[in-house]
Amino acid sequence: MPGKIKKNLFGYNEEMGFTKEELKEMSLSCPSLLCTDVQRKVVPQFEVLHNEAKIPHDVLAKFPSSLLAPWVPTRSRLRFLQSLGRDQFDPKLANYVSPELLTVKSDEIFCEKAARCSPVLFDDYQRTL
C-alpha cells in the first residue's frame, strides 16, 4: 500500500475516529478520499460536519463525498440553517438535512431543498458575515 494512502487511512481511523467498516464503505463509494490530503482538505471539513453540525460518523460514512467539499461554504450554510432553526441532521427525525444537501455545489439547490427559502435570503445572510 503506498505511503500516502496508508497515512490517509491512519488519519481517517485514528484522528477522525472512523471504524474500519466505515472506511471500507467510504472507500468503495468515493475512492478519491484515499488520495486526498487529509490534513489540509478533509480535517477542516470534518470539523464542521462532525464537531459543529454533530453529524455522526455512520451518517458521514454514507455520504463520503461531503468530506471533500470546501469547508468555508459548508460552515456558512450550517450557520444559516442554525439561524433558521433548520439544522436537523438526524436521519430518524423530520426535516432531516443530509450532509449531501449541506455540501451540494449549487446554492439554489441548497436553498430549495435544505433551507427551504429563496436564494436571495441566503445571499443577504452571507453579506452579513
PLM segments and residue spans:
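Long amphipathic alpha-helical repeat/alpha-solenoid cores
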Residues: 1-129
